[in-house]
Each structure stands twice: as C-alpha cells, then as structure tokens.
From Swiss-Prot:
This is UPF0312 protein YE1254. SUPFAM superfamilies: YceI-like. Coiled coil: none annotated. It comes from Yersinia enterocolitica serotype O:8 / biotype 1B (strain NCTC 13174 / 8081). Its main location: periplasm. Gene3D superfamilies: Lipid/polyisoprenoid-binding, YceI-like. It is found in: Periplasm.
Amino acid sequence: MFNKTLLGLTVGALMFTAGSAVAAEYKIDKEGQHAFIEFRIKHLGYSWLYGSFNDFDGSFTFDEKNPAADKVNVVINTNSVDTNHAERDKHLRSKEFLNVGKFPQATFTSTEVKKNAEGYTVVGNLTLNGVTKPVTLESKLTGQGNDPWGGYRAGFEANGNIKLKDFNITTDLGPASQEVELILSVEGVRAK
C-alpha cells in the first residue's frame, strides 16, 4: 500500500508539469496543503483505503505552446507515508512494502509530456523500493495566474496507476489490491 502511495506521489509530481507561454520553472508549493500526493488501494475488494505522503519536494517547467519541453522532478520521503493508522503506517514502512530503511526516497523524473484532448500525458521514471519503472500520468491544468503576493502560480491535477509487483512489493493483499491509484494535486510558484 505504501509503495503504491509512493508511486502515486511520483505520478503526482509528473502531473505538475503543464503550461505557460514560455518554459518557466515552478517550485511546488507544499505549504497550506497547496500540493499533495495521495494514493488509494482496494481494501479487501469492499472499499478504498486512502493514504498520502506528507513530505516531498519538487519542481516543474511549463510551456503551453511546447509541452514536449516540459519537465517534472519530484522527490518523496517514503517515511512520510500516512494512512491515519499508526500500525498500518509502520507496516508500510517495513521491508514488506516501502523498505524505508534501505530506500528512504522515491523519485519521479519525467521523460515525455504530450498535449491531449483532456490535458497532458506525462510519462516518466518512478523509482520506488529500489526499482525504476516508467509510469504514465494523465494531468490537467486547473488554473494559472498572479497571486496576491506578487508571484505567478500554476496548478495541476493528475492521476495514474501502478502495480505493486512492478516495484518488488510482493506481499499478497488479495486479487482486488494489486494496483494502487495515484491522485495528485500540485500548485507551483514560478521562479522570478
């Protein structure tokens, strides 16, 4: 579950790439819940279990006219996994899932950004639990413009799915719990 969460965070980072007229660099604004990386996985096939990574950092570039030039980079502290249940979180941090003692960070680095009818497809490499695999996120620009403090911001939402076994997370959670859905929302502040 935690591995899925990490993947979700990585996917979220990828989605943070989106557009302005010139390729501008944005720093992800984590303060005040302006950005989050969440995940969900089926619990016994009956309901959803939600979680998040509370400690991450990243940046993205955004050029509305040339999405192919966009980049997304995110680093996630895997120890920050949070499902609002201390014992489960401890288990997720263990060798059976995220193995945070050996792999304290997960990273996402985009390799391709393409415009589509709904927004942007962001493809990148997610490194989680010591394994690097390509991940695809579907992203939408939620808005952009000047903020009240003299800065310029752009926001994106994204989602994608990862398979636990792809990242060497082999604990059997049942047939309904083999994939983790990543849910990302990011707001970036443009560098001055």
